[in-house]
C-alpha cells in the first residue's frame, strides 16, 4: 500500500503491525534501533567537534582495528536493544553472541558502524541490521545459523549529508529521512523499485590483480563500453561504505560487487553474511532487485559461524543476472583481453 510522503517511521510501523500482528515485536525493535541511530547521527554530525572519532583502539571480532566511533555506536545500539524484545545480538564489535533478555522472541545481527575507514575524513558511514526469530535451545548461536529468508526485517542507516533509515519488514523497502526539526524519521521513498538495468557499477578496482576470472571478465567488458560486448558505456562508483552504495543502487539502479579473491583470507570476500550481506540482500530483493554470492541466492545461505564472510553481488536484476552468466560459463572467461593481460594497462 502506498503511504503518504512525510509520514513518520512510527506510523509506518503501526501500519505494518496492523497488517501483520506477528510483527509487533519486530516493530518495537526497529523503533529502538531508530532511536539509537538518531543519537549516533548527532555524534557523527559533530565530526571532530565530538573528539577524535577515528582514534584507533583494540581489534574487533574480525581482526579489524576498532575506531572510537565503532565503540560508541556499538555501545549505543546495545543499550537500545536491551530495552527491546531481543534475546541475542550478534555484533561485528563483539566476538561472541551477546545474550540480553532470556525468553525474548528475537535475535538481532548488527554492524553498528559500516565504513569505518571513512570516519576521519568526513565521508559516509552507516549501520546495518537484520532481525530474526529466536531458535529455541541452549545454544545462543543457533538463532543466527539459519537462512537469511528467516529474517523478519532488515535495514540500514546512512549517516551522510542527510541521515536516512532504510527498512523492510517483508512488505517492500522504504527510505525514511531524519527531519532534524523534530528528530523524526519521515518517509521520502515509498515502496522502492530498482530499475532492471543501469550503466553503473561499484567495485574496489584496486584489487583487480586478485580477482578471479568471472569478475575480471565482467568488469573488463564494462570498461570496453560501447565498443565492447555490453554495447554501452558504464560509470564506476566506490564509497568504501556498503550502505552508501546500497542506497544509490536502490534509488538509481546499477550493480555492486564485493567478490571473493585470491588474497589470503579473502576467498569469501570481506563482508559478513549475518550483519552485512543477508540484510542488504533482503532489502534489495524487497525492492525488486537481485542479490547473489556468484553461485546462488544470498538469502538461502546458512551461516556456520557468527562472523562468516560471503561474496556479494547485488542490484538491478539484469546486471546481477549478467554477472551470474560469467560465473556459470555462459559468458567467455577472463584472459582474452589486453586490458587485464600481461601487457595491458591493468596487470592481473
Swiss-Prot record:
Domain of life the protein comes from: Bacteria
Enzyme class: hydrolase
Disulfide bonding pattern of the chain: none
Residues annotated for Mg(2+) 1 binding in this entry: 92, 111, 113
Subcellular location: Cytoplasm
Enzyme Commission number: 3.1.3.11
UniProt cross-references to InterPro entries, sorted A to Z: FBPase_C_dom, FBPase_class-1, FBPase_N, FBPtase, Fructose_bisphosphatase_AS
GO molecular function: fructose 1,6-bisphosphate 1-phosphatase activity; magnesium ion binding
Amino-acid positions noted as binding Mg(2+) 2 in the UniProt annotation, renumbered to this chain: 111, 114, 276
Cofactor(s) in the UniProt record: Mg(2+)
Gene3D superfamilies: 3.40.190.80, Fructose-1,6-Bisphosphatase, subunit A, domain 1 (3.30.540.10)
Keyword set, alphabetical order: Carbohydrate metabolism, Cytoplasm, Hydrolase, Magnesium, Metal-binding
UniProt record similarity statement: Belongs to the FBPase class 1 family.
Database matches in HAMAP family: FBPase_class1 (MF_01855)
Name of the protein in its database record: Fructose-1,6-bisphosphatase class 1
Organism: Methylorubrum extorquens (strain CM4 / NCIMB 13688) (Methylobacterium extorquens)
Lineage: Bacteria, Pseudomonadati, Pseudomonadota, Alphaproteobacteria, Hyphomicrobiales
Name of the gene encoding the protein in the UniProt record: fbp
